[in-house]
């Protein structure tokens, strides 16, 4: 399970390595590396087709800030969570998972694989609270990862441009409005542009959390995240649609 060769754009994002994991043994090795390293915080994100309880989970990304793993859930399925140990790892309250709006991801994980992060910090909550405080008013809507990373990298033009190029290359393959199809996440081997895109999605989450937790302290954020994820998972409807843009914290 050797790190893939990084593109220059990803190197500028300061990722230590991007590892594609498509075997149960690879998942087990990944989790041993995380645990043996004493990692207390792990960035997480998911990719798939219509990602929610009614869709398909294809990719799960984890990053400890030094290495990013892109786990092939489409190929491994339940084995990644059972024999691989992902379910038990996610249920460990000693590990803080750091993500951006975990509602749709949790909806997919709970209904498709009976898995859920026991401890979750939502960078979207922190970013929105930061914005509200800086502008002196409460915005009625949440904003996405793109705006949050743009704000985070406002003084680092090189990294911002590298991220923009990486995201554009990936979106061109899977975003329908750009001529792509979400089904490409099921293509194997996974196109390099999608591997880079997936790795980039978690590249900055830990740094963003550390910078913005002054606006949204960990325990306070975890409670807000728990409430909004519970609401999404317990809803009779999948966690998707225009209502997801309304601020719910």
What residue spans do the PLM features occupy?
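Acidic, Mg2+-coordinating catalytic module of metal-dependent nucleases/exonucleases
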Residues: 159-235
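Acidic beta-strand-to-loop metal/phosphate-binding motif
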Residues: 43, 95-102
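Short active-site loop/helix that positions an aromatic residue
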Residues: 103-114, 128
């Amino acid at each position: 399970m050797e790190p893939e060769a990084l593109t220059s754009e990803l190197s500028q994002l300061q990722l230590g390595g991007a590892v594609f994991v498509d075997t149960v043994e690879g998942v087990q090795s990944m989790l041993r590396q995380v645990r043996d390293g004493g990692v207390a915080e792990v960035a997480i994100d998911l990719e798939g087709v219509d990602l929610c309880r009614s869709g398909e989970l294809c990719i799960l990304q984890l990053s400890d800030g030094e290495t990013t793993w892109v786990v092939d859930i489409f190929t491994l399925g339940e084995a990644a969570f059972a024999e691989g140990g992902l379910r038990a790892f996610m249920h460990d309250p000693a590990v803080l998972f750091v993500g951006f709006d975990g509602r749709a991801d949790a909806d997919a994980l709970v209904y498709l694989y009976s898995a859920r992060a026991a401890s979750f910090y939502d960078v979207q909550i922190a970013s929105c609270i930061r914005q509200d405080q800086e502008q002196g008013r409460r915005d009625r809507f949440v904003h996405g990862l793109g705006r949050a990373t743009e704000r985070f990298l406002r003084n680092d033009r090189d990294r911002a441009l590298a991220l923009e190029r990486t995201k554009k290359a990936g979106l061109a393959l899977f975003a329908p409005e750009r001529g792509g199809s979400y089904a490409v996440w099921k293509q194997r081997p996974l196109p390099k542009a999608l591997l880079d895109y997936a790795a980039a999605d978690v590249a900055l989450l830990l740094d963003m959390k550390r910078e913005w937790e002054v606006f949204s302290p960990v325990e306070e954020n975890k409670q807000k995240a728990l409430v909004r994820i519970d609401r999404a998972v317990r809803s009779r409807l999948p966690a998707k649609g225009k209502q997801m843009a309304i601020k719910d914290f």
